[in-house]
């Protein structure tokens, strides 16, 4: 019996911290409809992701995927940098 291919979760967000070695903090924003009033409100989540080459900088838009736990709080890995932040 063949194993079914498990779909890998991928998310896109913005890097808000790159101070840790080989780790970035990514802010994921989503819009959720309020259950009573019906207005769409922004909700956000911060996730730690593994950045093996330390290539990300603050403000970059990145794509991350779920992976095995790397540490207590880190279970996501960097897939690609979608858009670089503007240098000031």
Swiss-Prot record:
The keyword Hydrolase does not apply. PANTHER family: 40S RIBOSOMAL PROTEIN S11 FAMILY MEMBER, SMALL RIBOSOMAL SUBUNIT PROTEIN US17M. Belongs to the universal ribosomal protein uS17 family. GO terms for cellular component: cytosolic small ribosomal subunit. It holds the Pfam family Ribosomal_S17. GO terms for biological process: translation. This is Small ribosomal subunit protein uS17. Part of the 30S ribosomal subunit. One of the primary rRNA binding proteins, it binds specifically to the 5'-end of 16S ribosomal RNA. The lineage of its organism: Bacteria, Pseudomonadati, Pseudomonadota, Gammaproteobacteria, Pseudomonadales. The keyword Iron does not apply. It comes from Stutzerimonas stutzeri (strain A1501). Keywords: Ribonucleoprotein, Ribosomal protein, RNA-binding, rRNA-binding. GO terms for molecular function: rRNA binding; structural constituent of ribosome.
């Amino acid at each position: 019996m063949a194993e079914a291919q498990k779909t890998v979760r991928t998310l896109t967000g913005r890097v808000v911290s790159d101070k840790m070695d080989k780790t970035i903090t990514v802010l994921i924003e989503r819009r959720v409809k309020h259950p009573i009033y019906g207005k769409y409100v922004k909700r956000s989540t911060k996730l730690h992701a593994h950045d093996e080459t330390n290539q990300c900088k603050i403000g970059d838009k990145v794509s991350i995927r779920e992976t095995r736990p790397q540490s207590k709080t880190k279970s996501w890995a960097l897939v690609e940098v979608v858009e670089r932040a503007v240098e000031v």
